[in-house]
């Protein structure tokens, strides 16, 4: 037998769900790295968790490590040997190399070739060794390498961990792993585990992985999170069918309840229907954030949208036959929460949105108050309203009035009691308060949708009107934060500016709005006129980098368009997609290869060209037929009107033949300086025209 089952359980106090979930997906990768480091060939590693334990299981764990060879390369023979001759022995430098390796025999040294040089060489062979001696060091290094964000110390232990560790149980090949002192965490190991808390607190001895799994199963611990999830979903499905309801299974919430339970049971509770007078988002948010309950909706016909039901699903970790007692306890807690919500909501309704003291709340240190932000957004919104009036289906005067009103009240709900309690309801509560105070419905909806999209694949504002409000917020935030140097770097993005920028691009692309990242940003920056000065090209570049997430396309095609002077967002996307269509067409395979080759030569000729240099040329100085042929083909394109971008790209790629012939027959660097300059200027014009569709030399397919 060359392998056996390995099981390691780390018994801990209750792990915080979110920290555990964030790190869980990295655990197999980290274990693989530790095994490889010690020459262990390990196949599939299964990692399980409950709130009280981390468990790793390997079906075929080797009994011995592999034999490995460790190579050491020293200085070149020429400088490591006496008189640069290896037959005359080592000098001080050569001896030093072997002494560092702890070797005493220097007489029979070896050499090898590295980077075409003969160098001193030594190989150490590491023999196979029993893996049982490596398991505990690997486990301890694994625990130390886990990153949960925060950690704690307890007692007099040397190391910290997210929660106190009570035991490490190792089961492998019948070996004894009892009473190993783990000084780092202050305990001695036991080959034992613990049951569900309600089954008892004592250790239960186990002598094999099989026995371990059986003990947990008998004692109400479902070790595999996938099985706990399946149990929850199956029970929810049963409740849906029995009570003719729809349960909203929120993915994040499901992951969380799986992480906080060892033996989950889904139960149906209810609350007083009187609470349904609250906006549904208050109820569902309170249930999810405070109590980890799943919301329930009434079953409706396909034509009707489901409405919130006065029920909820609680996932209990308790082992009890008296389910009603658990349900009643949760109903009592929820009633108190919703009573508070009613109090907050009714208090908010008494306060006119106009009276919100925005001047009392700082937006960001150094960037004024919410009132200052509102005033900046108002100027941006006026500019965008005038720019997009043809998409608003109303007179300009009316549009400006409504947009101005929307901006004026957009931030008022940030000072409400409900949003103070549930910050994720910002905008949503503003919508409800606006409707209650008889604001125009477009205005109210734009307040709700100003923060959209909330994530990469989330819904966008539902109209151009709402989009103007959302864009104004985003543009001001970018200008403001960039102006005080709060620019994302590395993985740090505390103000979520990457997401905000992506949302800006996505809105503009979705509605086909004209927006030039150079001209419009400059105009808006100057129009608002209160931002601290900074290089707008930094912001422009930051926004251009987001296109790689916006368009599903070969990155080199995106780069080819971004390398041109095109800065209109919609036109950039159109050009990228048109180039992709052309290049993906099998009929164009040969044509594109020929053009890539010719265009790279064209680009090389012009790489050091000063864009401001005079570029005039005269056909009277053309001497070769191929010059005239290329000019005629090029001029035909320049003077044509194309029905579509696709046909324009087709025409430009058709220049591959005359370009090839030109480069075969025409010497650009003619001895006659006037002819040479004329040819360079002509090719510069051809090159610049190509940039109307993309910088072809960037494309790598």
Curated annotation (Swiss-Prot):
The gene is glyS. Its EC number is 6.1.1.14. Belongs to the class-II aminoacyl-tRNA synthetase family. It is an enzyme of class 6 (ligase). One of its GO terms (molecular function) is glycine-tRNA ligase activity. Disulfide bonds: none annotated. One of its GO terms (biological process) is glycyl-tRNA aminoacylation. It catalyses: tRNA(Gly) + glycine + ATP = glycyl-tRNA(Gly) + AMP + diphosphate. The lineage of its organism: Bacteria, Pseudomonadati, Campylobacterota, Epsilonproteobacteria, Campylobacterales. Its main location: cytoplasm. Keywords: Aminoacyl-tRNA synthetase, ATP-binding, Cytoplasm, Ligase, Nucleotide-binding, Protein biosynthesis. Tetramer of two alpha and two beta subunits. InterPro entries: Gly-tRNA-synth_bsu, Gly-tRNA-synth_heterodimer. PANTHER family: GLYCINE--TRNA LIGASE, CHLOROPLASTIC_MITOCHONDRIAL 2, GLYCYL-TRNA SYNTHETASE. GO terms for cellular component: cytosol. This is Glycine--tRNA ligase beta subunit. It is found in: Cytoplasm.
